[in-house]
Structures are given as C-alpha cells and as structure tokens.
From Swiss-Prot:
Post-translational modification: Autophosphorylation at Tyr-429 maintains enzyme activity.
Coiled coil: none
Lineage of the species this protein comes from: Eukaryota, Metazoa, Chordata, Craniata, Vertebrata
Matches recorded under SUPFAM superfamilies: Protein kinase-like (PK-like) (SSF56112), SH2 domain (SSF55550), SH3-domain (SSF50044)
Lipid linkage positions (S-palmitoyl cysteine): C3
Entry GO CC: anchoring junction; centrosome; cytosol; plasma membrane
Phosphotyrosine sites (modified residues): Y429, Y540
Protein species of origin: Danio rerio (Zebrafish)
Tree of life domain: Eukaryota
Swiss-Prot/TrEMBL GO biological process terms: adherens junction maintenance; cell differentiation; cell surface receptor protein tyrosine kinase signaling pathway; convergent extension involved in gastrulation
Compartments in which it is found: Cell membrane; Cytoplasm, Cytoskeleton, Microtubule organizing center, Centrosome; Cytoplasm, Cytosol; Cell junction
Protein's recorded name: Tyrosine-protein kinase yes
Length: 546
C-alpha cells in the first residue's frame, strides 16, 4: 500500500476490438465500493466472439474458470464470494443432520471447540455467520466451530476426494505438486455443466512428462453418473471406487486422493472483528514502508497472523473501519483475507500470514530468482484470477504491483492491500506527483486526473508483468517519475524485456492502451495466462470406448 520499501509462445492472434455491448466500469474516483452504473449487471459479460474484453470469446476456448473460490477443497469450496450463513443451503442442521469434521482444529478461544478430522457434530445454531454453535458427539462438549471445516455426514462434501468448486487450473496446480504420483486424483464441480462433476487425474507420458487429464462426469436423468456410457453408477462414490480398481478407459487407475491443505477459517473466531490491541503480540518485523510496518505476530496466544501497523494520521479511523467492513466480505482464494482490525490509532490490520513475503522480495532475494517462465506466468495467472474476482464484484484495487502481492508455499500468490490506497491522507501521496505515489505503476488517466477504475488496475497489471519477467526490476529503468509521466503521455511504452516472449509483451501493450476501455478485462487476461502453454489441448479427455 502506498510506498513500500523492498529489502513458448502463444499470443493474442486476432486484432483487439472494444466491445460496444460491454461498457467499461464507471470511475471510482470518490468511492471504493460498488459501481452504481453496474449494479444489477450480470457477472457473465457477453460480447462478440473476437473481443478481448470478454472471456466468453472464442479466442480462449479452453480457459479455466475465473470464479474459483477456494483452491484447497473441503466444504469451504461451497462458500459464496461474500459472507453467508450456511454453506450447505437446504441442509437441515438443527440436530436432524449430523456433520463431520474435514480437518483438525485447535480452539483459539474459550468459546471454541477443539476437534479432530472425522469427529461428528450436532449443529445447535448455524444462523450467525461463519462460526456455528455445535455439540460434539464424541465428547458431548458445546462450542463454536468454523463452518468451512465441516460437511454433512455421509454427503459427497464429506468425501476426502471431493474438492467442490475448484477450477481446472487450481486442480492442476495441486495435482502437479512435488510428491504426488501418477494416478493421484480429485473430483470437483464441473465449471461448464450445472449438476455435473469433473474427475482430474495426474498422469505421465514420455512426450509431456507429468500432466493432468480431466474427465467430465455426467449425470443421468435417472440420477446415476457416468464418464463413459458403458459404465454407469448409482452414486459418485461407486464411480470413484470402480476407477480405483480398474482404469477402464481412463488414462490411469485412480491410486491416491490428492492431498489437501487446511483452508483458512473465515475470521479468527466468532465475534473477533474489532479486537483489543493487547490480544496481539508483534514478534518479527517483516517490512517497513512510508505509512507503517508489517509484522508477523500472534493473536490471543494461539494464532499466527500478519499485522500491518499504520502510522497515526495515515488515514481516518472512521473511514478505514467503513472500508474494512467491505474488504472483509471480499472472499476469494487469491485475495489475502482480512481477519480483524484494531480501529483506534495506531490502526492495526490483521490478515493471513503468508510465509514467503512480498512477491517483489521473493523475486529479488528469495526463491523467485530461480523461477522459469512457466512458473512466472502461472503466478501472473493467479493474480489475474484474484483481480478478475475484484472486477466481477465491481471494486478496484488502486495500487496493484509486486510489492502488494504476497507469496505462500507452492508459489501460491494472493493480492493484498486492495482498496486501501484511496484512504491515504498524506499530501505527498494524494497529490499523485509526490515521491510516495507509485507513478510508474499508475495509468496516465489515474495519475493525471484521478480517474481510477478497474481499467487503471489493468494498466498496473501490465507493469506488474514486467516485474515478474525481470525478477523485480523497477519499471522504466533509468527514468524518473516526471519523465515517465511525460513520455507515456507521448505514447512511449516499455520495450519487450530480455527473455520475454513477444506474445507476452503484446499482452502488456494491450494493458497499456491509451483508451481505458480498449484494455482487456481481467477475465480475459486470466484465461490468456492460464492457457499460455496449453492452448492447443482439449479441456476434457474422452474416456476410451465412449
């Protein structure tokens, strides 16, 4: 946020045309929040087939879903993108249906219940948000449990191999992690067919090496399931059991369920939003910027968190608290979740702790120095995924750059500090010309006239792409801010960085179109990047002997 000090080839093949049926979002100059011109607009943008502003275009027919919510499965994958009371709508939880724990959980407060994977619960109250009051069948104790850690007993959500609402690309990321063998698999909701599922399997062959095959599991009118018409099953469970015993037309027999990663809880605990400063312990300083510091710390003596401390006067506590209420509802697996706040100055912002730090430091000084283009493009695709969600929610980031992306294990990237830049009251920042303002990342219409929209975020994303491929080099090397502003206004754009494919540079240049509404959507950018190395392959494999 603000000024942070930092310790093959597939291209767009058709001429980019703006879509007259898809107007750009209105300016968000004065307000970070829903765009009143877009309220009621369908999230599925429609447009001509060769339009970069729509991912439903024919240009990327094999694109993964931009609506992935949680990459690591479990019941959390049933959550919507904003706060909900019951992730299992229609399930009676008042003692009629029992729930089973999908993961271990260690109580964080005296009101919580500790439990182990496989424990069973009777739900007493599930109407108060993300933490449910429950009674453990195993111990008889009552307390609160995170609702995304449980699923109805004997349901498909309770199966270890079921990963819920997960996109194709995230399934591939998980299955291709080191340690997984050929035949490792998962089942997820189909992105393209309502009521259907997809089976994703890790495979290997001499030509492609390790890869993932996807099979559509179709539903019969009678209620059964099949991949190939000659092998039909009453339940998904029976289908999975069959293919663990025989490949029977698949690329390989199902051998091992894909290991999952325990999801983040939605918030620290029940009613732990505005928290006392004393409940936080600052332990290790991770970084320092113009407006504050970032620490690794512990909440309530139990939970590791990241804590951003803001210098007094950086922003109004009232405005921040109002903004934070919006930010905590923006839930997506590629956004750093906001856990809690200390709302009196000095303001503290409590978020998930990401072990590898900022993307900028990771590229310059960490393991990122050794990454090759496929990994860098995949990280860019993850960031585009998070920004596509912000785009669908009609919000804007305002300060998108590598310093504001955080990295976790297995090259997971999450977007941080979305929306906070609007609240900064520092004169050197608000003037947009001072040393604290990130001119080199900012679209000209935003830097000169304060016209911040999702399309100015697209411009910033193009700059972020240069940071990725150059391993953290400052944009416009050798140029000062004023010079950058003048040159960009005259039409100057950064040349193709060394080692960067021309097709990727072409995407950067699309992001830097002078007219904001000629820049692509994040939905399109995500699709382009996810399929950068695989655009010639079909999304789903046919089973043999269909």
């Amino acid at each position: 946020m603000g000024c942070v000090k930092s310790k093959e080839d597939k291209g767009p093949t058709q001429k980019y045309r703006p879509d007259p049926t898809n107007p750009t979002p209105g300016s968000h100059m004065g307000l970070y929040g829903p765009d009143p011109t877009q309220m009621g607009q369908s999230p599925a943008l429609k447009g001509p087939t060769n339009n970069y502003n729509s991912r439903s275009s024919g240009l990327t027919p094999f694109g993964g879903s931009s609506s992935v919510i949680t990459p690591f499965g479990g019941a959390s994958s049933s959550f919507s993108t904003v706060a909900v009371n019951n992730p299992f709508p229609g399930v009676v939880t008042g003692g009629v249906t029992f729930f089973v724990a999908l993961y271990d959980y260690e109580a964080r407060t005296s009101d919580d219940l500790s439990f182990s994977k496989g424990d069973r619960f009777q739900i007493i109250n599930n109407t108060e948000g993300d933490w449910w009051e429950a009674r453990s069948i195993n111990t008889g104790q009552k307390g609160y449990i995170p609702s995304n850690y449980v699923a109805p007993a004997d349901s498909i959500q309770a199966e270890e191999w079921y990963f819920g609402k997960m996109g194709r690309k995230d399934a591939e990321r998980l299955l291709l992690l080191p340690g997984n063998q050929r035949g490792t698999f998962l089942v997820r909701e189909s992105e393209t067919t309502k009521g259907a599922y997809s089976l994703s399997i890790r495979d290997w062959d001499e030509m492609k090496g390790d890869n993932v095959k996807h099979y559509k599991i179709r539903k019969l009118d009678s209620g059964g399931y099949y991949i190939t018409t000659r092998a039909q099953f009453d339940t998904l469970q029976k289908l999975v059991k069959h293919y663990t015993e025989h490949a029977d037309g698949l690329c390989y027999r199902l051998t091992t369920v894909c290991p999952t990663v325990k999801p983040q809880t939605q918030g620290l605990a029940k009613d732990a939003w505005e928290i006392p400063r004393e409940s936080l312990r600052l332990e290790l300083k991770l970084g320092q910027g113009c407006f504050g510091e970032v620490w690794m710390g512990t909440w309530n003596g139990t939970t590791k968190v990241a804590i951003k401390t803001l210098k007094p006067g950086t922003m109004s506590p009232e405005a921040f608290l109002q903004e934070a209420q919006i930010m905590k509802k923006l839930r997506h697996d590629k956004l750093v979740p906001l856990y809690a706040v200390v709302s009196e100055e000095p303001i503290y912002i409590v978020t998930e702790y990401m072990g590898k730090g900022s993307l900028l430091d990771f590229l310059k000084e960490g393991e990122g120095k050794y990454l090759k283009l496929p990994q860098l493009v995949d990280m860019a695709a993850q960031i585009a995924d998070g920004m596509a969600f912000i785009e669908r929610m009609n919000y804007i980031h305002r300060d998108l750059r590598a310093a504001n992306i955080l990295v976790g294990d297995n090259l997971v990237c999450k977007i941080a500090d979305f929306g906070l830049a609007r609240l900064i009251e520092d004169n050197e920042y608000t003037a947009r010309q001072g040393a604290k303002f990130p001119i080199k990342w900012t679209a000209p219409e935003a830097a000169l006239y304060g016209r911040f929209t999702i399309k100015s975020d697209v411009w910033s994303f193009g700059i972020l792409l240069t940071e990725l491929v150059t391993k953290g080099r400052v944009p416009y090397p050798g140029m000062v801010n004023r010079e950058v502003l003048e040159q960009v206004e005259r039409g100057y754009r950064m040349p193709c960085p060394q080692g960067c494919p021309e097709s990727l540079h072409e995407m950067m240049r699309l992001c830097w179109k002078k007219e904001p509404d000629e820049r692509p959507t994040f939905e399109y950018i995500q699709s382009f990047l996810e399929d950068y190395f695989t655009a010639t392959e079909p999304q789903y494999q046919p089973g043999d002997n269909l």
